[in-house]
């Protein structure tokens, strides 16, 4: 299984100040073979401008690709926040540049962001908030096609005013089955996002996702830290790789030009 990170952000994303070069050198220092920058783009996001300067982004990553070509493979990707009201604009943006890889994510519902104990959670118990978020994710996977992997299904577990923010597969089984079934049938990848892997409940959630995705015919898994700084939680990456292998997935999916790569066995394993 290749050692990689397929979800992280640099200063090209509005919520990060990290230098792209630092991500590259940190990845090389820890033996990663391949990385993919996945900068944010969200249309009309409340409270923050998640625009993306594509010429500058591609120029910088192309320069790093050339500089480090003998040490690590670097891909250029995108994390696209999907609001189906702006489906046409989103598709135009994705098609406007030669991205290697696109993550589809849900960061807001309507005009309300799912972030940091905000309005989204008011007058909702945890289970109601999680159900609303997952239904929005289901709407995206059923009605949007222009992406490779669906990002952080546990995003709603990061935020909210609850003592226990964790999300459980069993409590959301019906919706999650529909999401996984849609991803599998459309041959989209499921992202394993290590952001919350310091909590054993997150490991259990992703273990359940992986096992059921496999049962439903899912083929492709991507792994990402969602790091907004160069430093990463390497133990969480190790835990995630172990879960992926236990579920019966022997390779992580990688992409070029938004097409799946024909992966070869890692020479470092």
Curated annotation (Swiss-Prot):
PANTHER family: HISTIDINOL PHOSPHATASE-RELATED, HISTIDINOL-PHOSPHATASE
Classification lineage: Bacteria, Bacillati, Bacillota, Bacilli, Lactobacillales
Listed Pfam families: PHP
Alphabetical keyword list: Amino-acid biosynthesis, Histidine biosynthesis, Hydrolase
NCBIfam families: hisJ_fam (TIGR01856)
Protein name: Histidinol-phosphatase
A GO biological process held by the record: L-histidine biosynthetic process
A GO-annotated cellular component: cytoplasm
Pathways per UniProt: Amino-acid biosynthesis; L-histidine biosynthesis; L-histidine from 5-phospho-alpha-D-ribose 1-diphosphate: step 8/9
One GO MF term attached to the UniProt entry: histidinol-phosphatase activity
Listed InterPro entries: Histidinol_P_phosphatase_HisJ (IPR010140), PHP_dom (IPR004013), Pol/His_phosphatase_N (IPR003141), Pol/histidinol_Pase-like (IPR016195)
UniProt-listed Enzyme Commission number(s): 3.1.3.15
Family to which this protein belongs: Belongs to the PHP hydrolase family. HisK subfamily.
Organism of origin: Lactococcus lactis subsp. lactis (strain IL1403)
Catalytic reactions on record: L-histidinol phosphate + H2O = L-histidinol + phosphate
Gene name tied to this protein: hisK
Main EC class the enzyme belongs to: hydrolase
């Amino acid at each position: 299984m290749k050692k990689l990170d397929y979800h992280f952000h640099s200063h090209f994303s509005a919520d990060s100040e990290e230098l792209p070069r630092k991500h590259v050198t940190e990845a090389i220092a820890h033996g990663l073979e391949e990385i993919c920058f996945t900068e944010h783009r969200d249309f009309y996001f409340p409270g923050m401008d998640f625009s993306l300067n594509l010429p500058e982004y591609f120029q910088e990553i192309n320069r790093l690709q050339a500089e480090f070509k003998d040490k690590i493979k670097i891909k250029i990707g995108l994390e696209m926040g999907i609001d189906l009201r702006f489906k046409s604009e989103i598709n135009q943006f994705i098609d406007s540049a030669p991205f290697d890889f696109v993550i589809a994510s849900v960061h807001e519902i309507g005009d309300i962001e799912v972030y940091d104990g905000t309005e989204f959670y008011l007058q909702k118990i945890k289970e109601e908030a999680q159900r609303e978020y997952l239904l929005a994710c289901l709407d995206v996977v059923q009605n949007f096609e222009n992406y490779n992997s669906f990002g952080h299904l546990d995003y709603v577990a990061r935020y909210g005013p609850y003592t226990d923010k964790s999300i459980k597969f069993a409590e959301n089984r019906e919706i999650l089955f529909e999401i996984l079934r849609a991803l599998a049938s459309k041959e989209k990848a499921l992202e394993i996002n290590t952001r919350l892997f310091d909590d054993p409940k997150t490991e259990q959630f992703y273990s359940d996702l992986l096992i059921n995705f496999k049962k439903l015919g899912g083929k492709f898994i991507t792994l990402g830290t969602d790091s907004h700084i160069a430093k990463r939680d390497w133990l969480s990456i190790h835990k995630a790789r172990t879960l992926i292998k236990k579920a019966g997935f022997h390779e992580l999916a990688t992409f070029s030009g938004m097409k799946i790569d024909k992966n070869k066995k890692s020479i470092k394993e």
